[in-house]
Amino acid sequence: MSAQGFYRRSLPDSAIAFSSVEGRQIFREALALGEMEGYFALAEQFHTQAEPAFCGLGSLVVVLNALSIDPGRIWKGVWRWYGEEFLDCCLPLSVIKENGITFDEFVCIARCNGAVVKPNRYNQSSLENFRQAVEQVTAAPGDIHLVVSYSRKVLGQTGDGHFSPIGGYHRQRDLVLVLDVARFKYPPHWVPLPLLWKALKPVDPVTNQCRGYILLQKSERLPETFFHVAFNLHQWRSVAPYFAEILPDILRKEQPDSIASFVSTILHNWPVEFTTMLHTSSETAETLEKLRAAIELNSLFDIVHECLSSDHGDAMCVVGKWRSQQPFVAETITAILLSGPETLYATLKPDLRLWLSEVRYLEKLISPLDIEISRLREQMSALQDFYTLYSKGHQCNIHQS
C-alpha cells in the first residue's frame, strides 16, 4: 500500500535541475563568468522552509543569515541565529502558517529584522531593470541578495504564489538559478530570465497587485541592539492610533507651552499598550550601562526623569504602576519618544516641534543611542507603513509552495 501524499514534483521542461549534468555545466560556466559570486553565502544558509506556507519566511531566513544579520535573540543553546520562528514581527506565525505572506508583508518583516529593503513590483520595473538587478546581486560577493515573489503557474509548476532567493545568473544563456526553498517539492533549478520576469506579472488575487522582486542588504548601522519592538502587526494596530490620532488630539487640546508640559501631558495619558512595546535583550545586557549613559546625556531624558520624579508622579496611573514593576522606565520612555513616529508631535507649537526635531536628530545622538534609535525607528516605520496598507483593506494572501 503506497503512502499518502506526494514525494516531490518533476520539473517542467522550462526548468533545468541544478544537479543535472546540464545544470552543473551551466554552474561551471556561470562561475567562470563571475556570475555566481552571491551564490556561496546563500548556499551556506540554504534550507527547506519549515511549513508548506513558509516560503516567504524560509527565503528570508536564508537571506538574513547569508547577510550575517544578528537577530539579537537566542535561537537555541547559546546561539543567536535566525529561524522562521523569529519572524513574527508583522504577523503571528499561526496566521502565516495558514495563509503565507504577501509581497508587502515580506518587506515589512525584512525591514523589522534589520535588512535594508528595495521592493520592485512588476508594474514599477521592467525586464531590463530586473536583469540589471540580477546581474548586480550575482556578481556581488554576498553583501546583497534578491528574492523573487512569483507565480509558479507561469513557470509550468504546480501551485501559485511563491518566494525564493536567486542564487546565480548565466548571462550568455540568460538563465537564472532559483534556489527553491520548497525542496520537498522542487529542487533548485535554472529558468530563463524572461520567463521568470513574466512570472512576476500575475496579480495577487487578495492584494490586487502584481508580484515582484526584492533587493536586500545589511544595514551599515546594525550591530547588536538592546531594544527591539515587541509587537507584530495585529498588536501594533492597537498602538498606531495613539501615535497618529489619540495623543496628537490630546496635545492639540492641551496646547502645552513647554517641553516639560508636553512630557507631563504624555506621561499622564501614557497608554498601557506602550508599557510592553519594547523588548529588551538580556543577551546584550553588557551594553546596558553604555546605553543608559548615552540616554541620560540626552536633554529629553532630563525632562522625562524630572516629570517622573515630581510630586505628581502618583497621578500617572499607568506609568506609576509600570515604574513599580520594572527598572529603567525613564530610559525606556525616552527611547520611545526619540524613536516614535513624527505624527505624535504634529499638533505641537512650532517652537516645541523644532526643539524635539533637534533632540531627535539621529546624527546628534551619541553611540550607542544613535544605533538603538535608528533600529527602533526602522522597525516602527515598517509596522506603521504596513498598518497603513492593512487599514486600506489589504489582507494576508495564501501562498502555496
Label the predicted regions.
Residues 200-375:
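Low-complexity, Gly/Ser/Thr/Pro-rich intrinsically disordered linker/tail segments
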Residues 83-163, 167-211, 312-313, 318-353, ...:
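Conserved active-site-adjacent core of cysteine acyl-enzyme catalytic domains
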Residues 1-39, 348, 366, 370-380, ...:
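Non-catalytic, low-structured ubiquitin/UBL-interacting segments
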Residues 4-92, 239-303:
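Active-site nucleophile-adjacent alpha helix/oxyanion-hole segment immediately C-terminal to the catalytic cysteine
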Residues 61-63, 172, 184, 220-222:
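Short loop/turn segments at secondary-structure transitions that flank enzyme active sites
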